[in-house]
Amino acid sequence: MEQVSPEVGALDEEALAGALHDDLEEGTSLLIDLSRATDPGLRDRARLLAARMVVPAARVTGEAVPGGSVRLGPVPGEGVDLDLDATLARLAESPHLEVGDLRWRGWRRPGRAVILLIDASGSVTGRPLTTAVVTAAALAARTGSDDELAVVAFWSQAVVLRPVRDPAPPAAVIDRMLALRGGDTTDLAGGLRAALAQAGLASALRRDVIVLTDGMANEGDDPLPIASAAAAARTRVHVLALSSAEPEAREACTRLAAAGGGCLEFLDTAAQAPAAVARILR
């Protein structure tokens, strides 16, 4: 703490960036602690920096194109081929074409809607919250102009932290997550319903729900039929499982992913989340 906040109210951005680079989980955990500091100046500064620093740190390096199939379509700038029909249409509007009037076609990935569903039951501190923040940051880093991102937290109730049609930058949800306070019980079925409601509002044809949970629900309906119905409606339900030594918890996560027709990834550390997200959405 002293390395990144050498004096009251001060925050060393360079030291904090170094901490995130050296250890994403520890650096994010430190940033969360700073965002909940008693010093209001330090707290506000940490929350201001959170999205700006965690999202780039959570980006998967070496991944040239985010996951998903690609198709040929209009692209900005110079693409692989001149779109002659679209360019001639511009010529019909104005006899004097400029470089900016040329229309190109290239490979682009169709838009996709991703809804991150966060288990916020119990005390939302420590590793679960750190993992949730890193996961949201990884998704924000992957969200392109044609994509949609929603974030929902649940315990005995469900709270939409970012609606799927939110015009704000995806990274803005990080600040809302830092202020998250959860509850004691776990209504996974209710959380799934809220996430699927957001998926139903999406414009993208491809829709994925990613559930970050230990799989242990102790309130509400059975979530498996809800996940199965989602898969039948072409919305896949994936699970990022917070690793647990309890066989029952691991089995619950396995069953949920299978019912939702999605992928299952076990996370031992928050730093594993970006790569897990990339595998799920490839």
Where is each model-derived feature located?
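Acidic/polar low-complexity segments with low predicted structural confidence
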Residues: M1-G111
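VWA/integrin I-like adhesion module and closely mimicked acidic/polar interface patches used
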Residues: G215-A259, E265-L267
